[in-house]
Amino acid sequence: MAQAFQFELVSPERLLLSAQVTEVVIPGSEGYLTALAGHSPLMTTIMPGVVSVKLADGKTDSYVVFGGFADITPQGCTVLAESATHVDDIDPADIQHRIDHARKVLEDASSNEHRTKAEIFLHQLMTLQGAILPA
């Protein structure tokens, strides 16, 4: 049986989850990564995506996050999300609104750097939309 460790998912509004878990899959800035007990220390930014959690009792849970940071230590993991919602509570209109806003930001980009960042963010949102919402 996998060793459990402490995990917390925090948004500006509230603490969404504080529990003993055996595995957390995080949408890191360099791609998805899995945190396990005893993980080497790591701090990374997170991109819009789904945080998947395997609880110590074997149940799984998923949350949609829109950016933030993950702090992983051998003893635990904390995700500080800019915005987070349980996957069952996600509002398709909210994701579409974020996509529409990202398109507007892309259209109004004043430099190549801003345009590139806006394109990446728009792509991340559209990938997220495809991953969690039915076609």
From Swiss-Prot:
CDD domains: F1-ATPase_delta. It is a peripheral membrane protein. GO terms for molecular function: ATP binding; proton-transporting ATP synthase activity, rotational mechanism. It is found in: Cell inner membrane. The keyword Transmembrane does not apply. GO terms for cellular component: plasma membrane; proton-transporting ATP synthase complex. It comes from the Bacteria. Its main location: membrane. It holds the Pfam family ATP-synt_DE_N. NCBIfam families: ATP_synt_epsi (TIGR01216), PRK00571.2-4 (NF001851). HAMAP family: ATP_synth_epsil_bac (MF_00530). Belongs to the ATPase epsilon chain family. Produces ATP from ADP in the presence of a proton gradient across the membrane. F-type ATPases have 2 components, CF(1) - the catalytic core - and CF(0) - the membrane proton channel. CF(1) has five subunits: alpha(3), beta(3), gamma(1), delta(1), epsilon(1). CF(0) has three main subunits: a, b and c. This is ATP synthase epsilon chain. It comes from Brucella canis (strain ATCC 23365 / NCTC 10854 / RM-666).
